[in-house]
Amino acid sequence: MSNAASERTAADTLRALAETIEQRRGASADTSYVARLHDKGLDAILKKVGEEATEAVIAAKGGEREQVVYETADLWFHTLVMLSASGVSVDEVLAELERRVGRSGLDEKAARGE
């Protein structure tokens, strides 16, 4: 791992990846997977997120650590594409996660009326 990469936080990595996704969004669908996904529209992106979520669940059920990491990375990547298509920034999601740190999940659900 390079020194720059080792100094990057997880949030920095997500932001950098989201920025790359935004840059590639307007590229040619012939040369960019991200552009191809965006050209297919939100429903196709959501289908892909669902597929990747299923693969992550299957990997976790199988118990192979490397597969769990690989499939979760795919899921997170496609979730970032979904956020891009939905006009939601990584920072909005990170802020929501930060808000939840230290808060009981049961309290969170109760506050939402679930």
Curated annotation (Swiss-Prot):
It comes from the Bacteria. Pfam families: PRA-PH. Gene3D superfamilies: MazG-like. Keywords: Amino-acid biosynthesis, ATP-binding, Cytoplasm, Histidine biosynthesis, Hydrolase, Nucleotide-binding. Its main location: cytoplasm. It is found in: Cytoplasm. GO terms for molecular function: ATP binding; phosphoribosyl-ATP diphosphatase activity. Its EC number is 3.6.1.31. InterPro entries: HisE, PRib-ATP_PPHydrolase-like. GO terms for cellular component: cytoplasm. The keyword Nucleotide-binding applies. The keyword Cytoplasm applies. Pathway: Amino-acid biosynthesis; L-histidine biosynthesis; L-histidine from 5-phospho-alpha-D-ribose 1-diphosphate: step 2/9. It catalyses: 1-(5-phospho-beta-D-ribosyl)-ATP + H2O = 1-(5-phospho-beta-D-ribosyl)-5'-AMP + diphosphate + H(+). GO terms for biological process: L-histidine biosynthetic process. Belongs to the PRA-PH family. PANTHER family: HISTIDINE BIOSYNTHESIS BIFUNCTIONAL PROTEIN (PTHR42945), HISTIDINE BIOSYNTHESIS BIFUNCTIONAL PROTEIN HISIE (PTHR42945:SF9). This is Phosphoribosyl-ATP pyrophosphatase. It comes from Halorhodospira halophila (strain DSM 244 / SL1) (Ectothiorhodospira halophila (strain DSM 244 / SL1)). The gene is hisE.
